[in-house]
UniProtKB/Swiss-Prot annotation:
The protein's name in its UniProt record: Kunitz-type serine protease inhibitor kunitoxin-Phi1
Positions of the record's site feature: Reactive bond for chymotrypsin: 49-50
Domain BPTI/Kunitz inhibitor: 39-89
Signal sequence region: 1-23
PROSITE patterns: BPTI_KUNITZ_1, BPTI_KUNITZ_2
Keyword Protein transport: no
Alphabetical list of Gene3D superfamilies matching this protein: Pancreatic trypsin inhibitor Kunitz domain
Function per UniProt: Serine protease inhibitor.
Amino acid sequence: MWARVLLLGVLLSLLADLHAASGGDAGGQKTWNPRISDCELPPEKGPCNNLELRWFYNLKSKRCERFFYGGCYGNANNFKEINECDRRCVSPDINKPG
């Protein structure tokens, strides 16, 4: 019985540490946001050789810009339509200073 209680306490402690490390309850600091992280990635053509016109969010210009995607792999900063890129990445949350 005590072993189960001890194990439960250890598991809850590990979960709390994991939650804090992932940005949850950061004491007023910005928390981790996967949408913003995706938009901060550089454009990634990937290893394939197709020439697919795609859009990526350029963190420096704060705009969605065109690039050629190879057709495989790449990353999440890769949108088929500029409207999708704008909707996901061009927002007040990203453009606000630190």
